[in-house]
Amino acid sequence: MSPMQKEVFLAIDEWWKRYGFSPTLRDIAYVRGKMGIGSTKRIVDRLVELGVVKKMDGVGRTIRPAWVNFKNLKEME
């Protein structure tokens, strides 16, 4: 994991611990300060490939550390 990937992962992890729900890409970019949303998305996608972050495509606020478990959002509809 690169230093920037680690920084994004820690931002996601801290967001979960502090607020109890997923950050948006915009939230992560804002916390990072100097990063755009496109760069944030690429890093989050890479973290998903590495298996340290999970998300559901097409559904908002589903970026979460791999250690977080919650009900499948489709079951709740």
Put a short name on every predicted segment.
Residues 48-58:
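A short, conserved structural fragment
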Residues 22-34:
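A short alpha-helical element within helix-turn-helix/winged-helix DNA-binding domains
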Residues 7-14:
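Pre-recognition alpha-helix immediately N-terminal to the DNA-recognition helix
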Residues 14-20:
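Short helix-capping/hinge SLiMs at alpha-helix to coil transitions
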Residues 44-45:
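Short, hydrophobic-biased segments on the C-terminal half of alpha helices
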Residues 39-40:
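Helix-turn-helix DNA-binding helix
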Residues 2-5, 19, 58-77:
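Short, cationic-aromatic polyanion-contact patches
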